[in-house]
Amino acid sequence: MIDKLIEIIRPVVESLGYEFYHIEIVKEDGERYLRVYIDKENGISLDDCEKVSRAISDLLDEKDPIPYSYYLEVSSPGIYRTLFTEEHLKKYIGNTVDIKLKSSLEKSTNYSGKLIDVNEEDIVIVVSDNREFKIPRKKIKKICLSGEF
């Protein structure tokens, strides 16, 4: 279903001049939310979110790709944005990231450091003691910008 939603939503977002960053369906407090994250070079305003939300909402009503009720949310990925894709990871090489692991690696499940390399197998960061630390991608649960630019 996510692929179908991307197929519907991405062209609308891009035609309005925004970057389609990510989409997710989440369940919180018994309610479902379709979250669409958009971006642009100078940041996203509330007006930008409203504009995209109106355009997407009309199209989703017409196509009706989700078989249950949900709330549509359009927002910026934020300063502490999650890096979901290979493109996101490569774009933010040189920035500080926070990494949460699925299981412990060297007695920790949380790491922070400057992202210096991304490849098929590993993410490489420089940690606080200036050593390079290689983290297997298969162990990563979530990777976000830390806000320290």
UniProtKB/Swiss-Prot annotation:
Per UniProt, what is the name of the gene that codes for the protein in this document?
A: rimP
Provide the family line.
Answer: Belongs to the RimP family.
Chain's role:
Required for maturation of 30S ribosomal subunits.
Q: Does the keyword Transport apply?
A: no
Enumerate the subcellular locations listed in this protein's record, separating them with semicolons.
Cytoplasm
Translocase recorded as keyword: no
Q: Which SUPFAM superfamilies match?
A: YhbC-like, C-terminal domain, YhbC-like, N-terminal domain
Q: What is this protein called?
A: Ribosome maturation factor RimP
* Record-linked PANTHER family: RIBOSOME MATURATION FACTOR RIMP (PTHR33867:SF1)
Biological process per Gene Ontology, one example term = translation
Give one Pfam family, short name only: DUF150_C
Record's InterPro entries?
A: Ribosome_maturation_RimP, RimP_C, RimP_C_sf, RimP_N, RimP_N_sf
Which GO cellular component terms, listed alphabetically, does the Swiss-Prot or TrEMBL entry include? cytosol
Key words, A-Z: Cytoplasm, Ribosome biogenesis
- Top-level taxon: Bacteria
